[in-house]
Regions:
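Alpha/beta catalytic cores of nucleotide-metabolism and tRNA/nucleoside-modifying enzymes
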Residues: 214-235, 239, 245-303
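Alpha/beta enzyme core
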Residues: 103-239, 245-256
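Short, surface-exposed connector motifs at secondary-structure boundaries
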Residues: 11-14, 91-96, 156-161, 232-236, ...
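Glycine-rich, proline-tolerant flexible connector loops at the mouths of alpha/beta enzymes
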Residues: 46-73, 127-140, 192-202, 206-211, ...
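Short amphipathic alpha-helical segments
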Residues: 30-32, 55, 112, 200-201, ...
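N-terminal capping/small domains of soluble enzymes
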Residues: 1-96, 102
């Protein structure tokens, strides 16, 4: 059996499969189905400084080979996360990644500060949120704001910092390089692609927010391309996500240069998808004579 262990920013993962934020809650529901200690890690539901009720419904709809969502970061707030959810995660036997979000720089800084001294292993910085003070544009769509928010959070946090990049930019590698120079210990990509669906009978968008984030198998080729481009530019680890539904997708991400992967929307249609992907990676390595997963990272051979 090959060694599936990976190291990202000093954090050891028993295997390279992490559940993606927003698709796994805080793990309790899935723990009723299987042993979640088998997972490499859990990136928790996006957490903000204060409780958020989320957007009004409808806020999820299906698309061909995917879904659109505008849930709006519904969550109990960081203090409730530490008090009510973290104790369960501490017993889960896997890496705990806190995904944090906010609408202003000071929100991010205060949220991450409240996670210092806790059992959280790593911070994942969601910079796809709108920056209210700058007119509502996403923190992740401007190099200047990526640099500013990454630097501020890095200074405030005692934990390794992974910055989650939005694909809704002209050049994602520029944002990755800026995050790296501002102190990010790793980057994860991609977050959702902005999309829209209209009901032709009512002439209204299917989502109450009009637009939403698209995820699922349809976005995989875009995510893979961006991971490949980013991994060739930065020196820090890259975690690949976006449309991974089967082990072959995960292997492609690893070959493209990802040190680990995150599985998200696939868990909605098959709760056991992350475990099947772990097993599939292991079988692929064994069948091809690899002794460790690190041997295939970045080994794609472009034409």
């Amino acid at each position: 059996m090959a060694d599936l262990g990976v190291n990202i920013a000093g954090v050891h993962f028993k295997n390279p499969v992490i559940t993606a934020s927003g698709t796994f809650g805080f793990g309790q529901e899935y723990a009723r189905l299987y042993d979640i200690s088998r997972l490499g890690g859990i990136s928790c539901k996006g957490t903000t400084l204060k409780e958020r009720p989320g957007n009004p419904v409808p806020r999820v709809c299906e698309t061909p080979s995917g879904i659109l969502n505008c849930v709006g970061l519904q969550n109990p707030g960081v203090d409730a996360f530490v008090k009510d959810d973290l104790p369960f995660l501490e017993k889960s036997g896997t890496v705990i990644i806190a995904n944090i979000a906010g609408s202003a720089e000071e929100d991010y800084v205060e949220t991450v500060s409240r996670l210092n001294g806790t059992s959280v292993d790593m911070i994942e910085l969601n910079i796809s949120c709108p920056n209210v003070k700058e007119g509502g544009a996403s923190f992740g769509t401007s190099a200047a704001s990526v640099e500013k928010i990454t630097s501020a959070v890095k200074k405030a946090s005692e934990k390794p910092l992974m910055v989650k990049l939005t694909p809704n930019v002209t050049d994602i590698t520029e944002m990755a390089l800026v995050a790296e120079s501002a102190g990010a210990d790793a980057v994860s990509l991609i977050n959702t692609l902005t999309g829209m669906i209209i009901d032709i009978n009512t002439k209204r968008p299917l989502l109450r927010n009009n637009t939403g984030g698209m995820s699922g198998a349809a976005v995989f080729p875009v995510a893979l391309r961006m991971v490949w481009q980013t991994a060739s530019k930065v020196k820090i680890p890259v975690v690949g996500l976006g449309g991974i539904t089967k082990w072959e997708d995960a292997v492609q991400m690893l070959l493209a240069g990802a040190s680990a992967v995150q599985v998200g929307t696939a868990s909605f249609t098959d709760a056991f998808a992350p475990l099947k992907i772990i097993d599939g990676i292991n079988n692929y390595l064994d069948q091809n004579g690899y002794k460790s997963v690190s041997e295939i990272v970045g080994k794609v051979e472009p034409w």
